[in-house]
């Protein structure tokens, strides 16, 4: 019995070893197969790349190299440097259009025609200069000529007008009653042509008879009050 048990234990131990060896061999076989497949795949990919390089040789990118141009060295900026601040863009502010205010036109009020007052011409007064006694003494004249001049007393020359005074026509002024906000001035009429001609004749011929005057030269109008 003991011998049978020992024989069975030995057989189990051998079987376990064989099973372990078989499992390890299977693992090694699978790993080998994977390696072989990987190598085949790499070989196949390399062969395809070589085939494409042979078919399209002109399409390979070539580096652009200029014989007379040296590479420009660029300084590496540290990453902590902040970017440069750009000036803010200022948009134009729309300004309100200034409208020109039209100036108010001054209202022109029509006034009645007023006859100009004619004045009589006067002859300028001739004032002869009388030499003083001191001036006579300063002159180099003989004494017999100076004595009669010194004894003479200067007499005033009467001032006379060449034309007699003529009456001046006074322009009638309107009389307005003190009524608030209701004042109507009377219309002034123009002087007739006959009165202007008569005034011209009086100026040209002062000897013309002036008095008596039966009618006034210009009609006098009474003011109208409301």
UniProtKB/Swiss-Prot annotation:
PTM-bearing positions, type Phosphothreonine: 18
PTM statement from Swiss-Prot or TrEMBL: Form 1-P is phosphorylated once; half of the molecules are phosphorylated on Ser-24, half on Ser-25.
Cellular compartments per GO CC: extracellular region; extracellular space
Sites of Phosphoserine modification: 21, 23-25
Tissue expression remark: Mammary gland specific. Secreted in milk.
Record Pfam families: Casein
Domain of life: Eukaryota
InterPro entries: Casein (IPR001588), Casein_beta (IPR016345), Casein_CS (IPR031305)
GO BP: any one term: calcium ion transport
Keyword set, alphabetical order: Milk protein, Phosphoprotein, Secreted, Signal
Molecular function in Gene Ontology: calcium ion binding; cysteine-type endopeptidase inhibitor activity; enzyme inhibitor activity
Main location: secreted
Compartments it resides in: Secreted
Signal peptide (UniProt feature, chain positions): 1-15
Family named by the database record: Belongs to the beta-casein family.
Function: Important role in determination of the surface properties of the casein micelles.
Name recorded for this polypeptide: Beta-casein
Gene from which this protein is expressed: CSN2
